[in-house]
């Protein structure tokens, strides 16, 4: 069996920044540091931060007064920000800047009284945060659609004053079909020049397609609650390549690889490379050879840290 590695894979700039914000806060201020929601959707990362003093909560009413709170990479609603400010909590915002870009678009449509359609998955924290940027006080409304069927049944107030945005971690192929359905049903609809799916999601989806084309089975390292990791698994399966979403080497079954010649490995944007290395080591123990990385798109994007953490870490 031969191992092939997707390129790029694993951590993106937004995840790197979010994890580093928690790390720096722990170093500068000491534990405990409260984090609203898992800072990124990866069990290994969350458990590591928890062991060092991060306390993960789902709502601010679980947070005592006079502590530091970090908002996760997925972003939060305006109501959460207002609650934190009203309680005087010290907040560091780890929202991915590409999610913030979508928030700004939604807030602008809200101010203009323009109805907005969000393409996304119900219940995902990014979707909840993005929906929560819309203030209907100016007469508009925001709607959530997941697929073409939702578009077909959607009732809006004014199809002439309508715009769309998208969750950043969706399947590009699925989203393209939903956007086409929106434009067909609502010809006057506005939106971003291209969808809001982030560069890292696009690059990892392109890479897994190449991997699935060249391999007999694909392993996606990522947690079950990671949206972008699930999309990678689905893309490989759509290309008729068996694919498995695993948290790490311990989730693998040797029988998956009976009769397999080429094993492809990729990782979601929240999965650290150490987990990929663990998978490679286990496969090699089962007789696999090599770990050749495919040609791919270079990523050199970085996002700046909050100023207070950046300055204090140098003292």
From Swiss-Prot:
Annotated [4Fe-4S] cluster binding sites: 12, 96, 198
Residues forming the catalytic site: 126
GO terms classed as biological process: dimethylallyl diphosphate biosynthetic process; isopentenyl diphosphate biosynthetic process, methylerythritol 4-phosphate pathway; terpenoid biosynthetic process
Key words of the record: 4Fe-4S, Iron, Iron-sulfur, Isoprene biosynthesis, Metal-binding, Oxidoreductase
Annotated positions binding dimethylallyl diphosphate: 41, 74, 124, 226-228, 270
Keyword 4Fe-4S appears in the UniProt entry: yes
Residues reported to bind (2E)-4-hydroxy-3-methylbut-2-enyl diphosphate: 41, 74, 124, 168, 226-228, 270
Reactions listed under catalytic activity: isopentenyl diphosphate + 2 oxidized [2Fe-2S]-[ferredoxin] + H2O = (2E)-4-hydroxy-3-methylbut-2-enyl diphosphate + 2 reduced [2Fe-2S]-[ferredoxin] + 2 H(+); dimethylallyl diphosphate + 2 oxidized [2Fe-2S]-[ferredoxin] + H2O = (2E)-4-hydroxy-3-methylbut-2-enyl diphosphate + 2 reduced [2Fe-2S]-[ferredoxin] + 2 H(+)
One example GO MF annotation: 4-hydroxy-3-methylbut-2-enyl diphosphate reductase activity
Pathway where it operates: Isoprenoid biosynthesis; dimethylallyl diphosphate biosynthesis; dimethylallyl diphosphate from (2E)-4-hydroxy-3-methylbutenyl diphosphate: step 1/1; Isoprenoid biosynthesis; isopentenyl diphosphate biosynthesis via DXP pathway; isopentenyl diphosphate from 1-deoxy-D-xylulose 5-phosphate: step 6/6
Pfam families in alphabetical order: LYTB
Highest taxon of the lineage: Bacteria
Annotated Gene3D superfamilies: 3.40.50.11270, 4-hydroxy-3-methylbut-2-enyl diphosphate reductase, catalytic domain (3.40.1010.20)
UniProt cofactor(s): [4Fe-4S] cluster
Keyword Metal-binding: yes
Annotated binding of isopentenyl diphosphate, by residue: 41, 74, 124, 226-228, 270
Signal sequence segment: none
EC number(s) recorded for this UniProt protein: 1.17.7.4
Cofactor detail note: Binds 1 [4Fe-4S] cluster per subunit.
PANTHER family per UniProt: 4-HYDROXY-3-METHYLBUT-2-ENYL DIPHOSPHATE REDUCTASE
Job description of the protein: Catalyzes the conversion of 1-hydroxy-2-methyl-2-(E)-butenyl 4-diphosphate (HMBPP) into a mixture of isopentenyl diphosphate (IPP) and dimethylallyl diphosphate (DMAPP). Acts in the terminal step of the DOXP/MEP pathway for isoprenoid precursor biosynthesis.
Family, per entry: Belongs to the IspH family.
Name of the protein in its database record: 4-hydroxy-3-methylbut-2-enyl diphosphate reductase
Record organism: Pseudomonas syringae pv. syringae (strain B728a)
Record gene name: ispH
